[in-house]
């Protein structure tokens, strides 16, 4: 069975062959929250030109060699920049990484960016990217810090990656840090004060729907 999607999360996929429309940018990730953040940002006018030129996919949709080969043939072969973000070492998705390295080797104008979701693997993964290792490390840390603003910066980096990563402005590589605790949707209002305590990680992943509904009811 084939499924054609723009942004694909894990839908208990085991055997489906995933393909997506051709685009300049491909983002493959181990982290479902990445897809949530990017999907929301692509709704903004700032990324109108990118909206139909990026495909995102949860790595769990590419479990077998058949799925990886099919996605490479039908989608990745038409891309100019592929960003892979994984939790684990090179062996976590060994066949997939091997095929991406082969894809990039065929055409040196293609850009492959491999990012780590953890600190301990960030150097070993960034150094096999086809771009400058330090820039790959910087982008890796940007995404690991989380939050809409850091993902906004990541999306702004993409067009520069396509041409020359050394042209990326510092403003898009500087991490935005969020205070802890972070006051989300806190307003100076009349009446009794009620605070909802939630995990900061949910805010950084933009999983705020429950909190917004609670705030609406309390107000």
Q: Where do the PLM segments sit?
A:
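An N-terminal assembly and electron-transfer interface module characteristic of large anaerobic redox
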Residues: 1-219
